[in-house]
């Protein structure tokens, strides 16, 4: 009788262990894949956004537009994460005098969003994080959406100013989306932000 109980206990213990192991394995597998796809798109954005290499502007190259000030890394474990994880992915400073809307020294923030299918939805909590970060001396916040993947880059890319996606009241921290806009209507409205030349993503005049 005692042996039967012991065997049952061992079977139950092994069953629970296997379940938790597989559940944990699946979680980290999905997290690793999701992070890989996100990181791959971020790297692609950096390489295609007229940013000077090594962080120094080469003013002899007329295509150089930005200096990369910061590139956030999403590092966290079991609820521990740095405050920097609340900031957008990229922080860039204008280094050209040829812009009509940016001056040398102007800083913009860029959040990269890769998805397998077209969709411009944003998580409310993410918006709140990024907008609180925008209380700093940053001129604009942009969302770079990448959809699909073919070869060494996304199939389509949109560079969308935050205010084209929602309004944000800094005093009340209220987020307002366009009223009664369907996803199809949103896609049609944002079509003008689709990039035709993916080699010069953030060449914003």
Model-predicted segments: where are they?
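Conserved catalytic cores of phosphodiester-cleaving nucleases, focusing on short active-site segments
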Residues: 49, 90-94, 100-116
């Amino acid at each position: 009788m005692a042996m039967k109980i012991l065997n049952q206990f061992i079977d139950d213990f092994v069953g629970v262990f296997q379940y938790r192991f597989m559940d944990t394995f699946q979680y980290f597998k999905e997290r690793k894949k999701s992070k890989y796809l996100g990181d791959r798109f971020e790297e692609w954005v950096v390489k295609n956004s007229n940013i000077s290499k090594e962080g120094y502007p080469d003013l002899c190259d007329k295509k150089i537009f930005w200096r990369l000030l910061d590139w956030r890394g999403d590092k966290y474990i079991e609820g521990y994460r740095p405050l920097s994880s609340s900031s957008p992915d990229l922080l860039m400073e204008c280094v050209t005098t040829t812009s009509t809307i940016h001056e040398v020294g102007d800083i913009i923030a860029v959040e990269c969003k890769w998805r397998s299918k077209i969709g411009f939805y944003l998580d409310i909590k993410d918006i709140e994080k990024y907008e609180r970060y925008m209380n700093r001396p940053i001129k604009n916040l942009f969302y770079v959406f990448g959809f699909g993947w073919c070869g060494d880059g996304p199939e389509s890319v949109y560079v969308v100013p935050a205010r084209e996606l929602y309004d944000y009241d800094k005093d009340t921290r209220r987020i307002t989306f366009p009223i009664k806009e369907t996803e199809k209507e949103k896609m049609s409205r944002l079509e003008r932000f689709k990039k035709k030349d993916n080699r010069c993503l953030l060449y914003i005049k």
